[in-house]
């Protein structure tokens, strides 16, 4: 006899994916070259002037890696940029182009507090265990807001920044009118 019931055993519930809106645990802030960076239970576990490594294999670890690696590669002083490139940036045409340009300039001092960005949060727009795309929100002393789109890839048991291909036409950084980060991380001023 047929009934109107529904047998869930034929179609078990689909397990929920990772929570892309969950904030990283135990976040504290450390200074790197004049910019405060978030570190916490999801990484980096190892941080020194020459490399920041040891991020959890999770959306939160990917987001922290995207933020930390983007700032560190941008502000790395002359004596550390090659080591940061080796440990924090994934191999590829983007890394090669960045290294070729980086060797032509010199960074000796921290960012000027009058112009330094302040990390405000992020939105994970894509995540799987091999790659994540993160929109990083920063604000500046003049009140402007920037969104840097960064991609990290899981390589050698850690998240590394994959720099855009030099021929890419989509800008990595854009201006935003509002702070629309899904996960708010407020660096101290």
Question: Which residues make up each language-model segment?
Answer:
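Solvent-exposed loop/turn segments at secondary-structure junctions
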Residues: 139-142, 167-169
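Short beta-strand edge/turn micro-motifs at domain boundaries
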Residues: 27-29, 35, 147-177
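Surface-exposed, charged secondary-structure patches
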Residues: 90, 94, 100-141
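Bacterial signal peptide processing site
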Residues: 4-7
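Glycine-rich, aromatic-bearing surface loops/beta-hairpins
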Residues: 175-189
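Core segments of small alpha/beta cavity-forming domains
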Residues: 33-104
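N-terminal low-complexity, Pro/Thr/Ser-rich intrinsically disordered segments
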Residues: 9-42
């Amino acid at each position: 006899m047929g009934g109107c019931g529904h047998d869930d055993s034929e179609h078990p519930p689909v397990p929920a994916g990772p929570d892309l809106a969950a904030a990283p645990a135990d976040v504290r802030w450390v200074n790197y070259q004049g910019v405060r960076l978030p570190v916490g239970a999801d990484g980096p576990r190892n941080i020194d002037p020459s490399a920041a490594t040891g991020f959890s294999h999770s959306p939160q670890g990917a987001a922290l890696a995207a933020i930390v690696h983007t700032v560190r590669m941008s502000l790395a002083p002359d004596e550390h940029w090659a080591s940061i490139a080796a440990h924090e940036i994934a191999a590829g045409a983007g890394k090669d182009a960045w290294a070729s340009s980086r060797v032509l300039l010199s960074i000796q001092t921290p960012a000027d507090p009058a112009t330094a960005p302040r990390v405000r949060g992020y939105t994970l727009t894509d995540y799987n265990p091999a790659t994540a795309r993160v929109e990083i929100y920063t604000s500046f002393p003049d009140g402007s807001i920037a969104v840097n789109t960064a991609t990290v890839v899981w390589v050698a048991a850690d998240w590394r920044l994959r720099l855009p291909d030099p021929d890419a036409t989509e800008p990595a950084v854009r201006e935003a009118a509002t702070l629309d980060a899904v996960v708010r991380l407020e660096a101290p001023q």
